[in-house]
Amino acid sequence: MTMTDPVADMLTRLRNANSAYHDTVTMPYSKLKARVADILKAEGYIASWKEEDAEVGKKLTLELKFGPNRERSIAGVRRISKPGLRVYAKSTNLPHVLGGLGVAILSTSSGLLTDKQAGKKGVGGEVLAYVW
């Protein structure tokens, strides 16, 4: 069966693994998921990610990040633009997650960017997810 929304699947796997205090989470690889993982690593929400060969296709493995007393680095994840209802934001009206404490991930003509990066470049796009 084909997957309708691979980004939502990635975020759900990440949310579930984070809630269960797993150290790693594995999912099918795609370039879009790898770019989302790049943003999560750059913003400090995950420790690292790697691409692995599997028997069929490739796998993306995310290493989750926890504090010294196993505090979660990700408090919440929400998918915003869905296949049934796309959500777009102009460069003048970019979302701010929790007053700037979280990150909005946008798909723009310049690739995947955070809300802060998109504001600096002056581009808008599809709002994929919020992470805080």
Swiss-Prot record:
Source species, domain of life: Bacteria
Protein name: Small ribosomal subunit protein uS8
Function comment: One of the primary rRNA binding proteins, it binds directly to 16S rRNA central domain where it helps coordinate assembly of the platform of the 30S subunit.
Alphabetic keyword roster: Ribonucleoprotein, Ribosomal protein, RNA-binding, rRNA-binding
Gene3D superfamilies according to UniProt: 3.30.1370.30, 3.30.1490.10
Species whose genome carries this gene: Arthrobacter sp. (strain FB24)
Gene: rpsH
Similarity comment: Belongs to the universal ribosomal protein uS8 family.
HAMAP family per UniProt: Ribosomal_uS8_B
UniProt-listed GO biological process terms: translation
NCBIfam families: PRK00136.1
A Pfam cross-reference name: Ribosomal_S8
Keyword Protein biosynthesis part of the UniProt annotation: no
Any single Gene Ontology cellular-component annotation: ribosome
Subunit structure: Part of the 30S ribosomal subunit. Contacts proteins S5 and S12.
One GO MF term attached to the UniProt entry: rRNA binding
